Amino acid sequence: MGEAEVEKSQMWLYHLGVRVAGIVAEKWFTPSVRGEANIPETGRAILASNHLAVIDDAVIPITVKHRDVHFMGKMEYFTGKGIKGKLTKFFFTNVGVFPVDRTGGASAESGLVTARTVLEMGEVFGIHPEGTRSPDGKLYKGHTGVAKLAFETGSPVIPVALWGTNVSQPIGVVFPHRFPVVVTYGRPIEVPKLEPEEITYERLRGLTDEIMRKIMVLSGQQYVDMYAQERKKQLKEEELLKKEEAREIPE
């Protein structure tokens, strides 16, 4: 796994952070946790969650007290320059986060390779199938990487629904507001381990859609059958159009 390898000896900061964050969260978010027993005591598992706020990747680990949860982090966390960049890389590496290139294609494959290794080690891997935060609180179409990981490793997929994190930390807000947060862990979706030639697009799309349906039921979110990245692009274009129209209005 190279520099991004998640060694158990590196997880001391993860456990320290979870303890400290847990104490703060109890006072600030008063998180309500449902279905934690659906996460196995041992063995590999994938936590597939909706994505509403930056704090999602902190809320999940502090509510899973009996397992370490590893997440992907954007490449920028690991490539920063100077002292700040080195400290950022050190922090994320030691809390079980590893880099992924979000441009997709072959560049993103290295992140999936690391995720497979984490699962093959019998660990818990957390992923947001939407690929980015929801721009409006709705649930968007999932990318098939989660299904590919599940089929390649035979890992059960546990749908996770976060509620309230986008109210606590709206887009653009750094420090979360005080607001109750709810985390619901659904029943595992058992997934067989398949050979590469058996992993067809139809199977990938089918399992991914099933996962997203489970998340939708748990979260109560409205589902939108398009990728969140596409919706964000639409919103930017709409905003630019509004600005252009405003300039054209005569005084």
Residue spans of the language-model regions?
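Short, basic, glycine/proline-bearing loop/turn elements
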Residues: 20-22, 94-102, 129-133
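Non-catalytic C-terminal accessory region of glycerolipid acyltransferases
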Residues: 2-13, 109-251
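Catalytic core of membrane glycerolipid acyltransferases/transacylases, capturing the structured
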Residues: 41-105
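Helix-to-loop junction immediately C-terminal to a conserved catalytic motif
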Residues: 14, 20-51
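Anion (oxyanion) recognition and catalysis
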Residues: 25, 65, 93, 119, ...
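Structural motif corresponding to alpha-helix initiation and N-cap regions
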Residues: 33, 84-85, 109-112
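A conditional alpha-helix N-cap/helix-loop micro-motif detector
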Residues: 29, 105-109
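Alpha-helical membrane-targeting segments
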Residues: 8-28, 80-96, 174-180
